[in-house]
Every structure is written in C-alpha cells, then in structure tokens.
C-alpha cells in the first residue's frame, strides 16, 4: 500500500491505526490505495499490508534521487526549497524485500505495518549524500516558498513521518542512507534510460537562474 492513505492533517508520526482519508497532496492515488486495502481485507482477512514512505534504490523509475544524481554528474548548482530543512522519510527497496521475507517466514502478529527508516533526513542533507555518491559537494541556491516546489524539485512541500514501531519488532535494522544511495547511484549509471525523467532543469534554467 502506501503512506498516502493518511490525511495530511493527522497527528504525526502516523501510527497504523490512524484515520485513513483523502490527502490533499496525494489525492486519488491515496484514496485508490485505501480502496485497495479494503478490497484485499474483504477477500483475504488475514492479509499483510505494508505502508511505505518514499521508496528508493535499484529499479526506482521515479525521478527523485536520480534527479539529484544528474545534477551532481553535470556539476550543476542545486536549487533547494528555502534552506532545505524539510525532512523526508525513505525506505530502500532491498529492505522492503527483506522485510517481506521475514513476514513470510515468521508470520508476525501485526498484519498492518508502516515500513521505513526510523529516522528522516532533511532535504539538504539528502542532497549532500546524493552528490557524495559521485565525490561531489553541492553548491546550493535557495528558492523561496512562493515558487511552486514541484516545478523544480522531486517532492511536494509536505513533511510527514510514519511510526515504524511495529516494523522494528521484526526488522530492527535498515540500510544506511549512505549505502542505500550509493547502491542506487551505481544502478542508475547503468539504467538511466529506465527512469521517467521530468523537465526540472528546463524550469530552473528558464525561471530561476
């Protein structure tokens, strides 16, 4: 499933028993996930449901870390939403697969689990780590809040956090961001054409430079 099932006004970090409702940022994507959860539980009452935050790593075709990798490889300045304090919560696809294996093997008591890294990371620190995968250090340009963030950056201006206490009971250790991003960068170098790129550079060069 997805963290998009939780409305943006809920109390964070979101526990699994939080209200599920439309989120103004995710819209139909989130409500479709709610409907899918309901349909699954009607058919398979003892099914397991996993709700991740932002996934990253090999085979991620969404233009998120790949966008920052492109900026690093092109020695571009990085246009940062304000000062980059907003935090993002991630989960590496390898951790997701390993967690699924644990669930299949151990059949834990909890059947609905938020999954993800326990600690979130600021946009600024995340970009620094992405550039470091190519032995680069980013030069930042601060973009004011008045500029629509999704025009030049991969994430909405929406900070959220999942409570992953249930996950930690059965899968306490997740991959470090440094190792996870390096793995993602190595994959991207060989599979750049598999990522659905967006025209962030075009917007930046036309409107922000």
Regions found by a protein language model. Give the residues of each.
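Substrate-positioning beta->alpha
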Residues: 62-68, 81-104, 111
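A short C-terminal helix-loop "cap" of Rossmann-like NAD(P)-dependent dehydrogenase/epimerase domains
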Residues: 69-81, 135-141, 145
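Flexible, glycine-rich beta-alpha linker
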Residues: 50-67
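C-terminal amphipathic/interface module of NAD(P)-dependent oxidoreductases
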Residues: 157-209
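Active-site "gating" loop of Rossmann-like NAD(P)-dependent oxidoreductase/epimerase domains
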Residues: 3-27, 42
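Active-site Tyr-X1-5-Lys
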Residues: 23-50, 64
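Mid/C-terminal beta-alpha module of Rossmann-like enzyme folds, strongest
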Residues: 97, 102-159, 192, 196-201, ...
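Substrate-binding strand-loop-helix patch
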Residues: 59-60, 87-94, 113-133, 174-176, ...
């Amino acid at each position: 499933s997805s963290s998009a099932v939780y409305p943006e006004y809920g109390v964070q970090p979101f526990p699994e028993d939080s209200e599920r409702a439309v989120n103004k940022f995710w819209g139909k994507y989130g409500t479709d996930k709610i409907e899918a959860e309901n349909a699954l539980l009607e058919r398979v009452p003892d099914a397991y449901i996993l709700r991740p935050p932002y996934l990253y790593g090999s085979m991620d075709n969404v233009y998120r870390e790949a966008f920052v990798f492109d900026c690093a490889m092109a020695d571009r300045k990085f246009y940062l939403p304000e000062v980059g304090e907003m935090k993002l919560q991630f989960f590496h696809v390898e951790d997701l697969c390993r967690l699924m294996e644990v669930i299949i093997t151990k059949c834990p008591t909890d059947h609905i689990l938020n999954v993800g890294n326990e600690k979130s990371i600021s946009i600024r620190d995340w970009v620094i780590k992405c550039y470091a995968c190519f032995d680069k250090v980013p030069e930042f340009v601060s973009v004011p809040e008045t500029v629509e963030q999704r025009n030049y950056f991969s994430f909405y201006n929406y900070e959220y956090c999942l409570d992953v206490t249930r996950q930690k009971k059965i899968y306490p250790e997740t991959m470090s961001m440094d190792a996870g991003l390096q793995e993602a960068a190595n994959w991207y170098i060989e599979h750049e054409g598999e990522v659905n790129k967006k025209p962030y550079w075009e917007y930046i060069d036309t409107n922000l430079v």
